[in-house]
Amino acid sequence: MRQPFLSGERIMAQFCTLCSSSSGNSSYIGYSGGGILVDAGLNAKQLCLAMDRTGVDPNSIKAIFITHEHTDHISALRVFASKFSVPVYATEGTLNALIKIGCVNGKFKADVIDENGIDINGMYVKPFKTSHDSAQSCGYTVDMPYGHKLAVATDTGYVTDEMKSSLVGCDLVLLESNHDLNMLKTGPYPYYLKQRILSKKGHLSNDDCAEFAKYLVHNGTKRIVLGHLSRENNDPVLAFETTNNALGAAGLLENEDYQLYAAPASNSERMFKL
């Protein structure tokens, strides 16, 4: 039984990863007035099951924001958006790519989000540039009605200046920690794929994530969720320890200065309430 919001309860901000890996990515951000999805990976049935596990009603979703057009971020998009009549937003380049591959079919509203952002039921969503091998990738910050700020920052080969400035002061950040460098370099992936992942248009490593996490915590972020972990080239414990050790070495105290979590690839039941 879905009971995400108890009668009379004011939920200021909620966040959960519905899925987070190289196989599928989708995050929920919401409050008592409804919620949004950032990306729609898996398939529509699996996505709805993931929402059910975390107590989110698909009918409460007011919009879907797409970071880029890669399959692990959009595989449920067309069916889910059509079934629940949910509007979809993406950068101009990403939206054009979605149209080209037939993901936008005219059964739901699809529109461009520009640098000015958009208000969705009191949630102010704004994109920031990332660096990925796609048409026009981005991450998103979400300013909630009661003052909290959350962000999804994955699929980038490095921390862009715009990403850095956009995330200052976020209360919670889903931050990419895609791969362990040694596991990737010695793993089974072909050379060209390893080079793609390691490039400036690839993915953040555990070490990259750890370095940026220090900056975020020093600038006010209290909760960091490590996301988009590779099943083949990473391990949740290793990802967690890499960033946690870096924060500790910088003189920051876990559970006092920050809280750190590694998002599971799927079957997440953790709903963060701010």
Predicted regions and their residues:
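Conserved catalytic scaffold of divalent metal-dependent phosphoesterases
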Residues: N116, G122-H132, D143-H148, T156-Y158, ...
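Cap/insert and terminal regions of metallo-dependent hydrolase folds
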Residues: D161-A262
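Active-site environment of divalent metal-dependent phosphoester hydrolases
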Residues: T71-I74, L95-A97, S134-A135, V159-D161, ...
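Active-site neighborhood of phospho(di)ester-bond hydrolases with catalytic His/Asp-centered motifs
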Residues: V38-G41, K62-E69, Y89-E92, A151-T154, ...
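Conserved beta-strand hairpin/beta-sheet module of binuclear metal-dependent hydrolase folds
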Residues: R2-T54, C138-T154, L172
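Active-site metal-binding motif and surrounding structural segment of the metallo-beta-lactamase
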Residues: K45-A90
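Metal-dependent catalytic neighborhoods of phosphoester/phosphodiester hydrolases
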Residues: S75-F84, K100-I101, N234-E241
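Metallo-beta-lactamase
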Residues: E92-Y140, M144-G147
